[in-house]
């Protein structure tokens, strides 16, 4: 049995990780999700399994593997494997509604949100919240399943033509539109439950088309990336979110509401990749920290690194 298997869907996003694993001499196997088949009674594929599933995979494969992966991770955890970003954090990644409830549990503010499972309920939800509103699919990625509506007439037309987003799980969120101060969103990256770094994406507050890594911003030159230091209160809060969700590696995003200066949290991403050009932006390569973490987990799992 290999020490490590990386369960993944998007090889381009994982290229820096794969290169680092080879550079450090890991005994590992890539495990593509697209055509994956598993036997629930069989042993796990490795002592340690690293889940790298992206929610945006629903855009790249009609017969997506989201719930297949959830079942596989649960089976492997039950069979004794150490699964990094296992079934518990994946269940949060699979539900924006659960993410918002988690943020509130920690005492964080979010955009005001109502959750339903029928398209016909959306207009009444929007009227309750007040325009403009954002309608979101419960499961999405890279901005998929997100639309802004500025009036009741516009929304009613979209509902009547079934043009409003709704999740692959039939759950939909209607959310207050929050104007991001200076058009900036901030992504906090965590590793092993600890704050690792944060980046500001300037210009991202006007778009929904963000993916798990700023490497995707190559075609969005209006968005710039820089390292930032959030307040200690926010660092502590995201650590608590990570702890409650069982998140080993991932990102949590927030923005500052330009109307009142309040930090509002809106996204939990267990597939958040590290910043591109890390030495230029951060002054260090977080893949080194990740490799150290993986070595430690392999050792704890009883394998040889």
Regions found by a protein language model. Name each.
Residues 6-7, 191:
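Short hydrophobic segments within beta-strands
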Residues 9-112:
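Conserved N-proximal alpha/beta basic substrate-recognition cap immediately N-terminal to
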Residues 209-263, 286-303:
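A long amphipathic alpha-helix within ATP-dependent nucleotide-binding catalytic cores
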């Amino acid at each position: 049995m290999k020490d490590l298997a990386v369960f993944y869907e998007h090889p381009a996003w994982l290229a820096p990780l794969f290169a680092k694993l080879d550079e450090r001499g890991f005994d590992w196997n890539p495990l593509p999700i697209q055509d994956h088949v598993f036997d629930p009674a069989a042993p796990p594929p490795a002592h340690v399994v690293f889940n790298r599933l992206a929610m945006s995979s629903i855009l790249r494969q009609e017969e997506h593997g989201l719930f297949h992966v959830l079942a596989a991770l649960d089976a492997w955890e039950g069979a004794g494997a150490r699964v990094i970003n296992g079934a518990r954090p994946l269940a949060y990644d699979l539900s924006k509604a659960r993410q918002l409830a988690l943020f509130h549990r920690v005492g964080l503010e979010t955009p005001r949100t109502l959750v339903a499972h029928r398209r016909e309920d959306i207009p009444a939800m929007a009227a309750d919240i007040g325009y403009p509103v954002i309608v979101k699919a419960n499961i999405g990625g890279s901005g998929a399943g997100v639309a802004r509506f500025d009036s009741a007439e516009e929304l009613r037309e979209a509902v009547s033509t079934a043009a409003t987003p709704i999740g692959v799980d039939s759950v939909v969120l209607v959310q207050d539109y929050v104007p991001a101060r200076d058009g900036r969103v901030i992504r906090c990256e965590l590793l092993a439950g600890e704050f690792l770094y944060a980046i500001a994406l300037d210009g991202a507050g006007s778009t929904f088309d963000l993916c798990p890594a700023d490497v995707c911003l190559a075609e969005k030159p209006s968005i710039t990336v820089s390292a930032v230091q959030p307040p200690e209160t926010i660092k502590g809060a995201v650590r608590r979110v990570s702890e409650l969700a069982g998140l080993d590696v991932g990102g949590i995003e927030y923005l500052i509401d330009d109307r009142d200066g309040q930090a509002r949290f809106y996204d939990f991403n267990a597939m958040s990749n590290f910043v591109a050009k890390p030495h230029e932006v951060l002054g260090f390569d977080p893949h080194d920290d990740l490799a150290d973490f993986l070595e430690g987990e392999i050792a704890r799992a009883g394998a040889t690194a």
